[in-house]
């Protein structure tokens, strides 16, 4: 069988079906893709995931704001003042202890609670913010046929998908090979990204 490109949702489904060689699992491949995406979004923190959002402008007296869609982890957060005001992360417990009152001012710290960012103190004014954060890769689907992860690292996708099929592949010797290949690809990508940041 000839090797095929893996650059779209459809091509990934076909490649996974070819590798699995189990026609009874073909309908489940989109589920395996979703599970693989959840797995690598948890494991990786690379530049392809970095996104800047300036969507939050504070409202006087409002201390909690929704995190952006796809938010995974904060990298840097500041008020776009002149000079900028960097916001330091503190734990939710510290936030409750230090900023429980109704006082307002220029925010100095933030914490994350569920899907919200909470500022301390509560803003006294409207401030534009800038948030550099890690965003989950856009999930593949019939309408979102590719993303940066599939374009740059099709091996992570393929081995991740094959690995998620494991519960259906009892005693299949290939599973251990796929697990090793997946872990190695994740490590390689993270290591390369770390090197690129320091060169």
Predicted regions and their residues:
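Glycine-enriched, solvent-exposed interface loops adjoining structured elements
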Residues: 2-199
């Amino acid at each position: 069988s000839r090797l095929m490109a893996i650059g779209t949702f459809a091509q990934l489904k076909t490649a996974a079906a070819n590798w699995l060689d189990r026609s009874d699992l073909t309908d489940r491949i989109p589920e395996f893709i979703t599970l693989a995406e959840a797995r690598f979004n948890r494991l990786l923190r690379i530049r392809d995931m970095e996104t800047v959002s300036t969507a939050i402008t504070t409202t006087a007296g409002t201390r909690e704001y929704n995190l952006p869609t796809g938010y995974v982890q904060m990298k840097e957060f500041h008020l776009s003042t002149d000079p900028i005001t960097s916001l330091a992360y503190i734990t939710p417990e510290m936030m409750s202890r230090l900023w429980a009152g109704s006082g307002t001012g220029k925010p100095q710290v933030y914490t994350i609670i569920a899907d919200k960012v909470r500022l301390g103190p509560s803003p006294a004014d409207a401030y534009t913010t800038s948030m550099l954060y890690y965003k989950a890769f856009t999930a593949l689907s019939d309408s979102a046929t590719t993303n940066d992860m599939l374009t740059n690292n099709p091996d992570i996708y393929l081995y991740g998908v094959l690995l998620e099929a494991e519960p259906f592949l009892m005693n299949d010797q290939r599973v251990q090979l796929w697990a090793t290949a997946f872990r190695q690809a994740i490590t390689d990508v993270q290591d390369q990204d770390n090197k690129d940041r320091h060169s």
